[in-house]
Curated annotation (Swiss-Prot):
Organism: Paraburkholderia phytofirmans (strain DSM 17436 / LMG 22146 / PsJN) (Burkholderia phytofirmans)
TM ranges: none
GO terms for cellular component: cytosol
Coarse class of the protein's main subcellular location: cytoplasm
Protein name: Putative pre-16S rRNA nuclease
Lineage: Bacteria, Pseudomonadati, Pseudomonadota, Betaproteobacteria, Burkholderiales
Cytoplasm recorded as keyword: yes
SUPFAM superfamilies: Ribonuclease H-like
């Protein structure tokens, strides 16, 4: 998805897990991400109702979903589950989804929390924030989404 230069865009990012989904929000002009909330992944209906409320509240222009890989870059079982989740987000909410390699995002989130820069009960949201920050850091100056 491409945006005109200088246009502000709100983004929601997701760190998908079988039990919890971390959510972060960010802005393309400030290029800052912050942890938002953790959605309990109880059932398909529950998670999409919760995500739908977040989308209605934040009105994002695009979504970012972290894709987990093994350290060597090989996919594993969670890679496919996260990809399915992102595809379902796109289908349900008609918003563009961008994938970000999330290797080490949880490790980095734990380090941030240990350093006093986050809350332990928000670990998954911190990981989503790291995923989104990686994406924002990669944006070109004309805000072209990849």
């Amino acid at each position: 998805m491409s945006l005109p230069a200088g246009r502000e865009a709100t983004l929601l990012a997701f760190d998908y897990g079988e039990k919890r989904i971390g959510v972060a929000v960010g802005n393309s002009l400030t290029r800052r991400a912050r942890p938002l909330v953790i959605v309990q992944n109880r059932s398909r209906e529950y998670r999409f109702e919760a995500v739908g409320k977040l989308i209605a509240e934040w009105k994002p222009d695009a979504l970012v979903v972290g894709l987990p890989f093994h350290p060597d870059g090989a996919p594993h079982e969670m890679t496919q589950l996260a990809k399915r989740f992102g595809n379902q987000l796109n289908g349900r909410f008609n918003l563009p989804v961008t994938w970000v390699d999330e290797r080490y995002s949880s490790v980095e989130a734990k380090a941030e929390i240990r350093a006093g820069n986050g809350r332990a009960d928000m670990l998954d949201a911190e990981a989503a924030s790291i995923i989104l920050q990686q994406y924002l850091d990669g944006l070109s100056d004309d805000h072209e989404f990849h």
